């Protein structure tokens, strides 16, 4: 009964057939005659995520018109760029886990990870050109710049003594939100939506992206195998997210501020991080971040 229900639900989705076509295109784009490259790309394919960004691009395109080849190549270009950025991020963050599984750099090494990420970036640009929409090509290029700039801002903030919510929002607008913004905008552009529709799609994508990142950051305060990352993982990488920033700015606790600075400097133990998480929970600032 469950299987029948699932199939009928899938068939009812407005972009089910187009998404299946996208998945085939995605899989075929991650192939190579080189054995090592093919092996790494296959591993990346096996652990891909929920693909919310291409789904958003397809839904927006369907809302304003009919999904076409330009839409599919735009969605693929953005998903490849997103995936490449994750491969590179794991190298920068020295992370050995991604989506609950071993990261590419943990299985292979940093050199292979960087080169495979570069290969995917080049493939992303290729598919942006296949949209035959110069606006989408420019969109993808600007997205790449934003992702890099967001990562640099985040790295530069590690040594900051202030706990700025403004910097936090600046980072997520240039990283997570930028991906959702570009996906929604590309979907609208691919079906030649009006300027007003493109503008609305862009704003909608940004709001979805910001909300998604805040929710993802909140997950870091709770343990769950389904989330795909251990509790306090962001803090182990020196990142203080919105709940932490709220509690640091709301309460004048010198001991916790010093601990937060040690977390940023990667000088905190697992026990320190667990203590800071518990402090944030007690102060109920996670609930404020939910709102």
Model feature map: region roles:
Residues 8-290:
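All-alpha prenyltransferase/terpene-synthase fold signal
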Residues 1-4, 291:
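Extracellular/surface recognition and adhesion modules
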């Amino acid at each position: 009964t469950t299987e029948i229900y699932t199939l009928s639900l899938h068939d009812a989705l407005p972009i089910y057939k187009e998404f299946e076509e996208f998945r085939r295109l995605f899989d075929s784009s991650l192939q190579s005659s080189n054995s090592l490259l093919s092996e790494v790309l296959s591993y990346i394919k096996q652990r891909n995520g929920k693909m919310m960004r291409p789904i958003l691009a397809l839904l927006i395109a369907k809302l304003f018109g009919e999904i076409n080849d330009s839409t599919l190549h735009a969605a693929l270009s953005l998903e490849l760029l997103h995936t490449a950025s994750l491969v590179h991020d794991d190298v920068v963050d020295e992370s050995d886990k991604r989506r609950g599984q071993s990261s590419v750099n943990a299985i292979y090494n940093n050199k292979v990870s960087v080169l495979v990420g570069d290969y995917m970036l080049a493939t992303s640009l290729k598919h942006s050109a296949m949209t035959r929409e110069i606006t989408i090509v420019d969109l993808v290029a600007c997205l790449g710049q934003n992702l890099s700039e967001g990562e640099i801002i985040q790295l530069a903030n590690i040594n900051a003594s202030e706990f700025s919510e403004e910097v936090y929002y600046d980072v997520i607008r240039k990283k997570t939100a930028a991906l959702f913004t570009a996906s929604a905008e590309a979907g609208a552009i691919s079906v030649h939506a009006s300027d007003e529709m493109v503008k609305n799609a862009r704003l909608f994508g940004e709001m979805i992206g910001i909300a998604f990142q805040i929710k993802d950051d909140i997950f870091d305060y709770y343990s769950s195998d389904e989330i795909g990352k251990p509790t306090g993982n962001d803090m182990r990488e020196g990142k203080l997210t919105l709940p932490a920033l709220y509690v640091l700015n709301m309460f004048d606790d010198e001991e916790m501020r010093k601990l937060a600075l040690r977390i940023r400097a990667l000088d905190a133990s697992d026990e320190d991080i667990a203590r800071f998480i518990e402090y944030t929970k007690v102060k109920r600032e996670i609930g404020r971040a939910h709102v």
